[in-house]
Amino acid sequence: MIRYRLLRERLQQCGLFQPDDFEVPPAASEQQLQLVHTADWVRRVLAGELTGDEIRRIGFPWSLQMVERCRRSTGATVAASRAALRDAVAVNLAGGTHHAFPDRGAGYCVFNDVAVAARRDRKSVV
């Protein structure tokens, strides 16, 4: 999405970050997504088997690019959470997709990246 590129460019123009400060996030694995989401929801999102009503609830059409973006946004939140635990600070410019439910998306959110990261951190810290 163009807004993420524009945000990154603006942060660099302001001198807050250098190009080397940014990393390409890993895509969240199916296993990570299933820490919060049902196996059926994850499978159907990845396979493009969503109903018209589910797509309308999310707010944008299904595409391979959408799936990749959602997986990487979630992976970035997981990575940022790990980095924050290790280094006391981290940023994910694309995170915050917290409207998704375990078995469905909503409000422009397919996966709940915040919940996935919290579950992952809880499993690794406890």
Map each language-model feature to its residues.
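HDAC/HDAC-like amidohydrolase catalytic core signature
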Residues: 1-124
